Structures are given as C-alpha cells and as structure tokens.
Curated annotation (Swiss-Prot):
Protein family according to the UniProt entry: Belongs to the FMO family.
Gene source species: Arabidopsis thaliana
Lineage, opening ranks: Eukaryota, Viridiplantae, Streptophyta, Embryophyta, Tracheophyta
Coiled-coil blocks: none
Induction and repression of expression: Locally and systemically up-regulated by the bacterial pathogen P.syringae.
Descriptive protein name: Probable flavin-containing monooxygenase 1
SUPFAM superfamilies in alphabetical order: FAD/NAD(P)-binding domain (SSF51905)
BP GO annotations: cellular response to hypoxia; defense response to bacterium; defense response to fungus; L-pipecolic acid biosynthetic process; plant-type hypersensitive response; response to other organism; systemic acquired resistance
Pfam families given in the database record: FMO-like
PANTHER family per UniProt: DIMETHYLANILINE MONOOXYGENASE
Record GO terms (molecular function): flavin adenine dinucleotide binding; N,N-dimethylaniline monooxygenase activity; NADP binding; peptidyl-proline dioxygenase activity; pipecolic acid N-hydroxylase
Binding site for FAD: G17, A18, G19, V20, S21, E38, V46, W47, Q58, S59
Binding positions for NADP(+) per the UniProt entry: S219, A220, I221, D222
Annotated keywords: FAD, Flavoprotein, Monooxygenase, NADP, Oxidoreductase, Plant defense
C-alpha cells in the first residue's frame, strides 16, 4: 500500500463528506478555499448512496431548500419530490455556487491524527476552546484514493466532519449463539445493502419471495411498500413487517383542515414548550400549559387514527404524538402503504425479541415466520464510522454514555479542538438545520464572535438534552424540533443578526420558520464580510 504526505495542500480547512451538510459547509466556507473529501464519485450523500425506487422527500419542496437557492422547477408543487429530483437539486446547487472545484471525489478519509501544540491531551480541559485557524496544522488527514489502496496525507488547521448520523455503517442487531443470520437458509441483508442494488436486481430479489422487513421507521416502511409493489399479480407473496416499537406517522401536513406548522413550527406554538436556559417563571408557565400541549397532541392523534388504520393493525403507539415529534421520530406514511396492507400484501407482527432459524424467524411467543428474504431496516451507526477515524482520547470523549455527541450549537465539540460537526443535530428540516449551522460555523472561523468556555458549552448542551429527556422517552438523540426557533435565535445573536426574521408581528408569531427566513439581506451580507 503506497503512502505519501502531501505538504502542498493549499487549503487550511478540510470538509469530510459532500452530502447536504458538506455542500452547505463548503458554500459557507468557500472564502477559505476548502478541500472537500468525498468517498463516492459525486455529491448527494445518503440521497445517492441509499435510496429505493419508492423513496421520496418527507416534506414539500419549499420546506427543503437552501436559503439562497430556491428550487428551480416546480417549487410550488405541494407533492413530495422523489429522490432523483432531490439529487438534481443538490447537483444544481453545487454547480451554481461553483463548489465542484473544491471536491476530491473517490477520496475516503480513513484516519485523522492530532498534531496540535504539545502532546495529545490525556485529561479533560474545561478552559478556553482556542483559535480555530491558529496559523499551523492541527490535524493530519489520511485519504485513500479510489480502489488503488494509495494513501495520501494532508495537513489542515480546521476539519469539518459532515458524514452525518447515517453514514454508511449499518446497525446490526445482536443475536444469541446459534440464533443469528448464519442459521437462516435464505437471504439476509441490511437496508443499506439493498439500496445499492440496481432496479432489476431489487425486483428479482423481492418478486415472488416471502419477505420480512425488520423495523417500522421510514426505511422499513419504504421497503415494505417496495416489496408489496414487486409482488403484484399472480404468484406475488406478502411482505411481513416485524415491529418492535411503533411510532406515530402522518399521511400529510394537514390536520383536520389546519396546516401542521400551527402546532409545532411557529413561535407561538413553540412558546408552549420547555427550552434550555428558561427562567423559573417560564418553567412554571410551561407546566401550567402542559394540559394544552396534551390537548394538541390528542387532537393530532385523533386525526391520524381517523385517517390511518393504526388500531386495525395493532400499530397504535402507547405514547403521545408529542413524544415522537420531540425526539424526531415522526414519519410521513406513503399514501398507498395501507392500501397494500388492506390488500393483504403488507402484514405486521409485533415482537420485541426475535431470532433466526433455518426457515425464517422465531418470535418470543414461540410463533414462527417463514421467509425467503430478511431485510434489516434497523438504522445506521454513523458515529461508529467516526470513531474509527478519530484518535484517542477524542474517540472516548466523542459521545456521552447516552450515545449523543455533546455539540455546542449542534456544531462544536468542546473537548475536540479545531473540529466542527455539521449534520448531527435533528429537527423537522435537517437541510435547514445543517445550513444554519454552516453559516454559524463560517462566522466563528472568521472570528466574528468568540466561543464561551468549554465548561459553559457543555452546560448548554446538557440543558438541551434535559429538555428532550423531559419531553420524550426517546431522548437518545440530539433533536431540537420543539425549540428549533429559539436555537436559531441563539445562533443569530452569536452572528450579530436580528433573530426576528419576519416582516410583521403576526407573521412572526404564527407563521412557520424555514430556510428562506435566514436568507441574508444586502446589509447583513456587508456586515458579515466587514
């Protein structure tokens, strides 16, 4: 394996990943001539590497766009665009802002080494964070070029990690001895492997087969629908979804004739929810209005139960809708999903424990499910990929025991110097979340404001997690959906921008906030570049 050290890298900033977050980071750090390492041969991230024939965006186009780049076509179309349209949009964004010249495709980052001042820290230091561009390299980055095995080393002052929480590392369930996939005589694969299949390969895999899909989140729902559609007509077999935990889903963004944003995405609606750093009086206020929040949740649940046959199939969650929204667990149910269930092409089996046997799956109640193909839609472990390239002791400090990375403003890890993270915080619009954090990070790198001490940054993160923990049992993720506007306000205040982005009070109070609200005016642009 060849290896060489590239001391001629002209950039001071490296960006790892060219998905949505990587593109947003590159565009906002363009004046630093960043080097963007992307393992694949094009931009798009998970939208290119892991999509199915039926995959669509979970929102309308206007709710998934960059602040300074509206959708060029069909922007006002309220339907959810398929993944090919999203890829085209992301590619157009990269070309419009001339970002491709910064890209190094076919370049997989396999290791980063700390080469900052002195020895690698062995103890937690809660003092000042330090300069993000100190004038000399802080990290060495090892990059594998294509399939050649050649390794190049580059040195940078600042590294932005944009591989995201999904990454390309599948989360595989653990099984007791002699009860794992090796016992099964059929085909076992993760959803990540399925989405790499060509259309004809996928159809051949599913058609006429007894398919079991493990999971009940977005990927699992898409896969079950895809299996049902591949088995239409004579000889078609039903797909069975193995469900451990049910979550609320909605058919569209209207509830009893009212737009969904009225309930969670306006200042008025989020005012009813707890937020970090709130006063005692505000805590008391939120406690008093907890009944109103419960009424809102029940109101939405009543519509979902009327519109979708969750009770018919035993899929009604035993927790509130608000819990799923507060932990970013809500999904949009495809319009023909339950149509296929009513036709008998999608079936459901609830079980918290299961394992393999020769013919299929055994459940904890002793029943069995025969299968030809088992697809594990059990999620991804993007942080495992991150841990593989980050050295100690930073690897140990990377996440808390809960599994959540302690990121200040969702971007800076207080214990890891000169490294930013974009795409690891969730909200109702992950593109908007990533873009705003990229804007904030750019101003931070440009020294437009200073970070507080590491201790204060960790304290702020803990307060955010406390809000999520008090709102939902599914708190092991950094989700800001119920206080996203206040989170954006804090970032605007850091950047010296007016956090109130609407033209009048009524819009400020009752209209939704999105990426277009954070498009910089001419005066703001001049202030930012001054």
């Amino acid at each position: 394996m060849a290896s060489n050290y590239d001391k001629l890298t002209s950039s001071r900033v490296a960006i790892i990943g060219a998905g949505v977050s990587g593109l947003a980071a590159a565009k906002n750090l363009v004046h630093h001539n960043p080097t963007v390492f992307e393992a694949s041969d094009s931009v798009g991230g998970v939208w290119r590497s892991c999509t199915y024939e039926t995959t669509k965006l979970q929102s309308a186009r206007v709710d998934y766009e960059f602040s300074d780049f509206p959708w060029p076509n069909n922007r006002d179309d309220t339907t959810f665009p398929p993944y090919l349209e999203i890829l085209d949009y992301l590619e157009s964004y990269a070309k419009h802002f001339d970002l491709l010249k910064f890209m190094k495709f076919g370049s997989k980052v396999i290791e980063v080494r700390f080469i900052g001042d002195g020895e690698t820290p062995q103890m937690v230091d809660l003092g000042a964070y330090g300069n993000l561009l100190p004038g000399k390299p802080v990290w060495e980055v090892a990059v594998q070029i294509g399939d050649s095995g050649d390794i190049q080393w580059h040195a940078f002052e600042f590294v932005v990690v944009c591989t995201g929480k999904y990454g390309d590392v599948p989360r595989i369930p653990a099984f007791p001895a002699k009860k794992g996939p090796e016992m099964f005589q059929g085909k076992v694969m993760h959803s990540m492997d399925y989405c790499k299949l060509e259309k004809e390969e996928a159809s051949t895999l599913l058609s006429g087969k007894k398919v079991a899909v493990i999971g009940f989140k977005k990927s699992a729902i898409d896969l079950a629908l895809e299996s049902a559609l591949a088995n239409q007509g004579e000889g078609g077999k039903a797909c069975t979804m193995v469900v451990r935990t049910t979550h609320w889903g909605i058919p569209h963004y209207w509830v009893w004739g009212l737009p969904f944003f009225l309930f969670y995405s306006s200042r008025a609606s989020q005012f009813l929810h707890d937020r970090p750093n709130q006063s005692f009086l505000r805590t008391l206020f939120c406690l008093l209005f907890s009944l109103l929040r419960a009424v809102v949740s029940k109101f939405i649940e009543s519509y979902v139960l009327w519109k979708l046959p969750l009770e018919k199939y035993g899929l009604k969650p035993n927790h509130s809708f608000e819990e799923d929204y507060a932990s970013c667990q809500m999904a949009i149910i495809p319009e023909n999903f339950f149509e296929e269930a009513d036709k008998g092409m999608i079936r459901f089996k609830k079980s918290s424990k299961w394992w393999f046997y020769e013919e299929g799956i055994v459940f904890e109640d002793g029943t069995t499910l025969e299968a030809d193909v088992v697809i594990l839609a059990t999620g991804y472990d993007g942080k495992k990929k991150l841990k593989a390239i980050v050295p100690e002791p930073f690897r140990t400090w990377l996440e808390f025991p809960s599994g959540v990375m302690p990121l200040y403003r969702g971007t800076i890890h207080p214990l890891i110097p000169n490294m930013g993270f974009v795409g690891y915080v969730q909200s109702s619009s992950n593109l908007h979340t990533s873009e705003l954090r990229s804007m904030w990070l750019s101003r931070l790198v440009d020294e437009k404001f200073r970070l507080p001490s590491k201790e204060k940054m960790l304290d702020q993160f803990l307060k955010e997690m406390e809000v999520t923990r008090n709102s939902s049992r599914f708190y092991k993720r950094h989700c800001i959906s119920t206080f996203s506007i206040q989170h954006a306000d804090d970032m605007c205040n850091d950047m010296g921008l007016n956090p109130w982005r609407k033209s009048n009070f009524l819009l400020e109070a009752f209209s939704p906030y999105g990426s277009q609200d954070y498009r910089l005016g001419q005066e703001e642009k001049e202030d930012m570049t001054a």
